[in-house]
């Protein structure tokens, strides 16, 4: 009679998410694949632009026998959405974004032409996420945090049990997201960081949309854009 309880305890402590990062496209964007022991996976911000990058992502998922269950964008600037269509068509998954990113997504191909990076945009079903939503991957839960400022509908994904945050372009190591772009607002971004991210434990590992990982505590103490 105690076996189900024991199994639940073991699953809670041992069924950990693995975070795999790829650096893709000319903007050096971080694409994330989060997966558990049951081989279920979430693809976040697939920035794979070139064919060899798409092949690299597919080979990793295939070789590790993963089954993508979710396709999520933290925001829809072009460098984070290049691979949306590829992932959706390969694994038959709809795109999940905040509703305020829909116009940003629709505008992405125009940005691509401006930067000489043309691409085929995602045109399938969209599932809208909001603050407080939970994305489940087996026993694991990722909490959706609404953190606008860099983009109007920017979200972050927080895993409380393992204390990590997929931060997109909100917070970087010793830096913050740009706000000198359409939909950006510096004061809103600073407020998002202070009120949504800096309330998390100092030990939380931050996986950003570009560059190396950091921690909440390190950025509180050292980020020059957030001093004072």
Go through each PLM region and give its residues.
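Short, low-complexity, charge-dense intrinsically disordered segments
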Residues: 4-10
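Short Gly/Pro-enriched turn/cap motifs at secondary-structure boundaries
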Residues: 22-24, 124-127, 146-148
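Residue-level marker for buried hydrophobic side chains located in beta-strands
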Residues: 42, 72, 95, 166, ...
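Conserved beta-strand hairpin/beta-sheet module of binuclear metal-dependent hydrolase folds
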Residues: 14-64, 156-167
């Amino acid at each position: 009679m105690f076996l189900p309880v024991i199994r639940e305890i073991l699953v809670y402590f041992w069924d950990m998410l693995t975070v795999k990062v790829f650096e893709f496209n000319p903007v050096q964007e971080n694409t994330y694949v989060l997966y558990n022991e049951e081989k279920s996976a979430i693809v976040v911000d697939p920035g794979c632009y070139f064919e060899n990058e798409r092949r690299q992502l597919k080979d990793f998922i295939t070789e590790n026998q993963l089954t993508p269950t979710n396709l999520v964008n933290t925001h829809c600037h072009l460098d984070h959405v290049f691979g949306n269509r590829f992932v959706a068509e390969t694994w038959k998954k709809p795109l999940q974004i905040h509703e305020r990113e829909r116009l940003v997504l629709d505008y992405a191909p125009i940005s691509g032409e401006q930067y000489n990076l043309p691409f085929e945009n995602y045109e399938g079903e969209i599932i809208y996420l909001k603050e407080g939503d939970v994305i489940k991957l087996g026993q694991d839960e990722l909490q959706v945090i609404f953190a606008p400022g860099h983009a109007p509908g920017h979200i972050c994904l927080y895993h409380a049990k393992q204390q990590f945050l997929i931060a997109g372009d909100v917070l970087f190591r010793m830096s913050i997201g740009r706000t000198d772009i359409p939909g950006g607002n510096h004061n809103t971004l600073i407020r998002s960081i202070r009120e949504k991210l800096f309330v998390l434990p100092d030990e939380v590992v931050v996986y950003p949309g570009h560059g190396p990982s950091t921690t909440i505590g390190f950025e509180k103490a050292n980020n020059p854009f957030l001093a004072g």
